[in-house]
């Protein structure tokens, strides 16, 4: 099919559906409610999150009078620094575990200008749950929505300033790893990654939104107390159930993790795009 005839919203929906089906029907919000995933992520943010926060804050203009909407706020990676710079922040976070960590972080820091809305963005009622309009709307690595076009339309409906979407560009290190492990453990099994920034850009383009883009790399360290903890963690991630599968996974992991003092580290590398536009120049 010719590119100009492609329905990029449908492409996103199909790729996200395939990805979720591959994960047993688990969407992004449900993933963070498994075990200690949310708290583990916050530990990684504390170790490595400053790099991304600096990348973002160096690029955007935020004033003390601004009202900010943070979609998929997670543990407060951006909501916390935003609270020190803006008049008000609305943090939308669907995961029970992530929302719990977020509220704990806000309470520990005595932050009172952040409202938490614990819902999927798709389920948020713009009039009942929010207080629009917002000067700044941000969705940072939180675009796990199936219908991304509708999700963006909702963002634009509550914004009269800039909208920033941070998302992955190309294969992440965990995409590469998942393909290798799947082939090792299960043979010729198709791996379906989430749709990436190329699809997102084209969705926006077909909506009549011609965004600005900048590309930036990031890395994060996932630390474990022991090598056995790594094997147990990724054994669950990759559904390594038999002794043979566990042995193969153990050998694979021994080649890709690093010893770091008394702990072991899995390094994640990923290239990203920040896609943004001034919504005051768009028709919603």
Residue ranges of model-derived segments:
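Conserved class I S-adenosyl-L-methionine
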Residues: 2-62, 65-74, 164-187
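Class I SAM-dependent methyltransferase SAM/SAH-binding core
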Residues: 77-78, 82-123
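A short SAM/SAH-binding and catalytic strip from SAM-dependent methyltransferases
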Residues: 134-150
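A short glycine-rich, Lys/Arg-flanked "PGG" loop and its adjoining helix->strand segment in the class I
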Residues: 149-164
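Short alpha-helix
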Residues: 192-208
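Conserved Class I S-adenosyl-L-methionine
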Residues: 210-284
